[in-house]
Structures are given as structure tokens and as C-alpha cells.
Regions:
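Blade/loop signatures of beta-propeller domains
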Residues: 26-40, 139-141, 203-212, 267-282
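Short loop/turn segments immediately following beta-strands, especially the blade-tip
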Residues: 75, 132-139, 196-205, 255-260, ...
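Conserved blade-ending motifs and adjacent loop-strand segments that build the rim/top face
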Residues: 335-355
Length: 377
């Protein structure tokens, strides 16, 4: 396969179809399309193309929106406030004000980590990781500092931009998509198509596994496409979810220094129908733990280990955009399997575990709802 043969304009337009396509049939495998939902769904608020959410210690939730707004929302009262001081965002294509994660010491420091797409010269853009202090009293972000800037690319897709904090709170993990350029995912000098491990100040963390082999010093793993979810489990294992090409969406167990294959291996195909070699034993690439064919176009991932849904402890939850779905993946050590698939009727962008153990979803689109999922009574 010669990935560079794809025309850039064709690739861009076809990739965007995954974000705007009608529903696709549910994931194949051991998952079941549950008839009727085993939870109550309560709409709590409506947002303009929401992208991500983060709960604060006082129960409020921060919601990012595609065009660049950050909303402080009180689920109990429905009151909301748009934060001032947010950066300028490039919202073309898949650009947005993206992920948001409170610092481990947020109660004292008020620090947030967030990501966004930044416009560059001409039509170029890049993904940015930044930090700022949240002043809830004044409704503003203060002392904003950029921690990492990705490489510029002409396309408006595959920014990724998901943020994870290591369980010990010492490191930032950050996903940098391939920007629809394919080959940089295998390029040691590029940060595109990679999982990065950074110190809290944005510098490459010492001990990253590939620096001695000539890779960019921040690289933790490589061979990735469009990484749209990341979460640590109770044992500190890092799980990552990414959107495949034409099908082949996948969940990976991220280990330091490994090559996850893109664009040389995928369980999907190119959008024009050309084959990509499937993952196979002995091919030198780390295969996904779970993949989907047909695609669900995953939007977000969360790890669940709370008590409100006791039978779902130690599970991953995956949202579907084109799939209009919520999937549960049961974990067993380093293994994962599909167990539940629920039709949610709308494109689902994000999922999080709330303070009391409820699951919270964000619908995609200009009137995307914030939904609270609790056990059916």
C-alpha cells in the first residue's frame, strides 16, 4: 500500500463523511444490540455543537463547544455562564475547542488543561495543548499558557487532541492525530499520529521509550490515525480509541514504544475501496483489542468503575457518531470484548462518569443535549 497515492482533497472530504454520515448498523462481534435501554435518560441541558465536558468538585460541569466557547453549567439549576479569556479557535472541518481536564489539584490550583485547533498562516492549522486557571467568580480563564503546539497541516481534520493525566498526576498524555497525511504516523521525527507523554509544563517527559531511537522526545507510541478517546483503568493501563478509515474503528491498549500500524495496517479500508492489510500476527504492529466493521465513528471514551452501575464496573464506554450509539466494552486484564450496544437515536460526541457514578453523554450538533444516565427503576 502506498498511502501517499490518495489525493488530499478527496481524503479530506471523505473523512468528514464519518462525522456527518447517517447511522450505520451496530458493531459486529459479541456485543448485543439491547432492545430497550437499561437506564433512565434525563436531558439536563442543550449546547451548541458541544465537544467535551469535565466535572468540577462542586458538581458544576464545563462544556466546550466547537466554535470556541467554554460553558460553566450547573446541572442542578440549569444556570450557565460563558467563560471569557478562551483562545481563538479554528473551527473549520473538525477543528474545535476540544478536550478539557481539571488538574489533579484543581480544588487548590484551579488549573485546567484543554486543547484546541489553532489557525496558522494561510489555511494551515494545528492542535494546541494549553493550561489556564479557572476563576468561577469572574467567569474567566486566567494565566493561559500554551504547553504544546503540533505541526501545521493544510487539512482541517484528524486533530485528535485528547488529554489524559497519569494516575500519579505527574504526566500529561496527549493524542496527536495524523492530520489526514498518513505517512507522518510512522515518521520518527513527526509528532503526528502519536501518543505523547509530557511533563506538566509541556516539556517531553524523561524516559520516553523512543527518544534513543531517534524519535521526537515526546513520543510514547506511534502508528495512530485519529485518536478520539483515552482513559486509564484501575490498574493504570492506558486505553485509547481511534476512528478508522472506511470501517476499522478500534480500541488499543497503549504500551510504551509500540507501533500500532497506521497507515500500514488497519482492519478497515481506504475510502475509495482500496484494501489496507489487516493486522496479523507477526506483522510487527500492535493489533487493536477491539475493532468495528461496520464502523460506528467513535466520538468519545470513558472508563467506568463507579458503584451506581455495579455490574458495569471495570468497563469502557464508547460513543458513536455515525452509529448514534453507546457501546460497553468489558475489560479483563489486558483483554477487552464488546458486550452491549445501545441505539441512542442521536449522534453521541462524548461520555464521562459523573461525581455520583451516573454516566453523562453529550449529543453532537447545534442543539446537542447533555444527558444523565441512571439505573432504570
Amino acid at each position: 500500500m502506498n498511502s501517499s497515492m490518495l489525493g488530499l482533497a478527496t481524503t479530506f472530504s471523505l473523512t468528514l463523511l464519518a462525522f456527518a454520515a447517517p447511522a450505520v448498523s451496530h458493531a459486529q462481534g459479541s456485543a448485543t444490540a439491547t432492545g430497550g435501554l437499561p437506564f433512565e435518560v434525563k436531558p439536563v441541558g442543550t449546547f451548541d455543537s458541544p465537544w467535551a465536558m469535565a466535572f468540577l468538585p462542586n458538581g458544576n460541569v464545563l462544556v466546550t463547544q466547537k466554535e470556541g466557547a467554554m460553558i460553566l453549567f450547573d446541572p442542578a439549576t440549569g444556570t450557565r455562564r460563558t467563560m471569557s479569556g478562551t483562545p481563538a479557535v479554528s473551527s473549520k472541518g473538525q477543528g474545535a475547542l476540544m478536550d478539557i481536564v481539571p488538574a489533579p489539584d484543581f480544588a487548590a490550583s484551579k488549573l485546567l488543561y484543554f486543547s484546541y485547533a489553532e489557525a496558522g498562516p494561510g489555511a494551515d492549522s494545528r492542535v494546541v495543548l494549553a493550561t489556564a486557571a479557572l476563576d468561577q467568580a469572574s467567569g474567566s480563564l486566567k494565566a493561559t499558557k500554551v504547553l504544546f503546539r503540533g505541526q501545521y497541516a493544510l487539512t482541517g481534520g484528524h486533530y485528535s487532541g485528547r488529554i489524559g493525566l497519569s494516575p500519579d498526576g505527574k504526566y500529561l498524555f496527549f493524542t496527536s492525530g495524523d492530520r489526514q497525511l498518513f505517512d507522518p504516523a510512522q515518521d520518527p521525527k513527526s509528532t503526528l499520529g502519536k501518543v505523547l507523554r509530557l511533563n506538566l509544563d509541556g516539556t517531553p517527559a524523561a524516559g520516553n521509550p523512543l527518544a534513543a531511537r531517534g524519535f521526537h522526545a515526546a513520543v510514547w507510541s506511534y502508528g495512530h490515525r485519529n485518536l478520539l478517546g483515552m482513559a486509564f483503568d484501575r490498574q493504570g493501563r492506558l486505553w485509547e480509541m481511534e476512528m478508522g478509515p472506511r470501517h476499522g474503528d478500534e480500541i488499543n491498549l497503549i504500551k510504551p514504544g509500540l507501533n500500532y500500524g497506521w497507515p500500514k495496517a488497519s482492519n478497515g479500508n481506504h475510502y475509495d475501496g482500496r484494501d489496507i492489510p489487516d493486522h496479523a500476527p507477526g506483522d510487527g504492529f500492535e493489533a487493536p483489542k477491539v475493532s468495528w466493521n461496520p464502523a460506528i465513528s467513535p466520538g468519545g471514551l470513558a472508563y467506568y468503575d463507579a458503584d451506581l452501575f455495579p455490574k458495569w464496573k471495570d468497563s469502557l464506554f464508547i460513543t458513536g457518531l455515525s452509529g448514534k450509539s453507546l457501546d460497553r466494552i468489558a475489560l479483563d486484564g489486558e483483554n477487552a470484548r464488546k458486550v452491549d450496544h445501545w441505539d441512542m437515536g442521536e449522534r453521541i460526541r462524548a461520555v464521562r462518569t459523573g461525581p455520583e457514578g451516573a454516566l453523562w453523554l453529550l449529543e453532537d450538533g447545534p442543539r446537542g443535549r447533555l444527558l444523565m444516565l441512571t439505573p432504570k427503576r
